[in-house]
Swiss-Prot record:
Transmembrane segments: none annotated. GO terms for molecular function: 2-oxoglutarate-dependent dioxygenase activity; histone H3K36 demethylase activity; histone H3K36me/H3K36me2 demethylase activity; histone H3K4 demethylase activity; histone H3K4me/H3K4me2/H3K4me3 demethylase activity; iron ion binding. Keywords: Chromatin regulator, Dioxygenase, Iron, Metal-binding, Nucleus, Oxidoreductase, Repressor, Transcription, Transcription regulation. Residues 1-53 are annotated as: Disordered. Pfam families: JmjC_2 (PF08007), RIOX1_C_WH (PF21233). It catalyses: N(6),N(6)-dimethyl-L-lysyl(36)-[histone H3] + 2 2-oxoglutarate + 2 O2 = L-lysyl(36)-[histone H3] + 2 formaldehyde + 2 succinate + 2 CO2. Oxygenase that can act as both a histone lysine demethylase and a ribosomal histidine hydroxylase. Specifically demethylates 'Lys-4' (H3K4me) and 'Lys-36' (H3K36me) of histone H3, thereby playing a central role in histone code. Binds 1 Fe(2+) ion per subunit. Its EC number is 1.14.11.-, 1.14.11.27. PROSITE patterns: JMJC. This is Bifunctional lysine-specific demethylase and histidyl-hydroxylase NO66.
Amino acid sequence: MKRGLEEEIEEMSEEEVGVNNNNNGKKKKKKVVKKSKPVPLTKSVPQVSSQPLRPTKLVPKKKTEIREININDIGSNELSVADQRVEADGVLAGLISPTIIEDFYDQYFGQKHLYVKRNGDNIYKNFFTKDSLDKMLRNNLMKFTENVDVTNYVDFQRITLNPEGRAYPSLVWKHYKEGCSVRLLNPQTFNSNVWKLCSTLQTHFQCGVGANIYLTPAGAQGFAPHYDDVDVFILQLEGKKEWRLYKPRDANEVLPKKSSENFTQEEIGEPYFTVTLEAGDLLYFPRGVIHQAVSPSDVHSLHITVSTYLNNTWGDLIGKVLNRALEIANEECLEFREGLPRDYTQYLGVIHSDKVGDERRKELTDKVGTLWDKLGQLLPIDIGADQMAVKYLLDSLPPVLTQLEKKHSIEDETTSMKIKPETRFRLIRADSVRLVVEDIAILFHNADNTRIYHQVGEEPGVVEFTLECVDALEHIIDSYPSYIYTKDLPIEDDDQKLDVVSALYEKGLIMFEK
């Protein structure tokens, strides 16, 4: 793998398209590719503002009409094929309605909770039920700890009671009848409805989306108070559950990078918000909000927690940018490779930090400042963004194809499609690919991913192309969701046009108009 992504992806396919095509004597023009240029820092040293930073707007302020889509209708409406990005927006809009998406991002996301009361209208009906849970256990090899937890919260202590081995239905229901909560980990692996929901929402958020399902008997609590490192949407599927939310204990726990340990009641104080969710209701709260939940004494609770924005922060992006900037500096700047002075340990370090007026210490700290200035001239922001996008793709769920998408792609072809210049095609999913241009053109995709989190297929989803193909690939990506002719691809060589489309077809990335 070429520089910039070599630390992210260790094993790549060796497949390369359009390398040794016969040009029939035609002389090709040399392809000129604009590479990402490092962006310099505006200050020589990091500056910390005394004013609080305002949250970055995640969507434009302009309010647009978005059709609301029920989660039971994912993949079975006209938007599923017309433009899956619009469908994804519609699914989120349906979840948070009557709040509109622009207001959600402006007022709630990453800031405070949102409670949506449906007044008894269970819009999630039949999405996932107790019977669905039972069938999942019976039809799949699910294991305790890996796929299923049985827990209880007794005398202010969480207790996990997982046996070893397979989670047989009889064992799970035995623990449930004894007052334990049942947690299904990554149910999208085994249930298509949950897979469709998570896969669709990851299209909207453009980062990983996961889920857990919780079944709690009447009058029980399965987990101690804690906060998570993800933003969560609680969808109450059956029964009722009382939720208590508590403010972060200090500023360092606002939007945390890691989940907390279990808290005692004394550590969290009184809740600032308490609500009982009924079937059809929704509750959103950001990462860092301390929470606990208990089912009423007269009814069980079944809910799904949909989570997102794990390790998807400015800090994560800047970390990748700085790491790559340091690699570049070590490669290109002699000063970064020079040895440290023998006496640096006598002047640098916490025990020497109070030697403010020491000339030798000042000389050494000034040197660090000079190197920081040079590092600031080498910030490869676009490479860092590519690394973030590629990591998301390799961790993401594969797309759930509609019947029409299967019918018009390699997924359902009994015989291989013969691609011609007049063939019209388009990407199946625009957000399922990422084009990275370095010494070659690399198209990453998630079509080969499995439904198990962090597990890709036998090989990561990668197709390599020559630089002559870059404009064609950009044209294909930018044209989505419109169909385009193979003959109209911006490549001089006609055979190479066919090669590009064939490569995408064989990887299951495109569908044909007819």
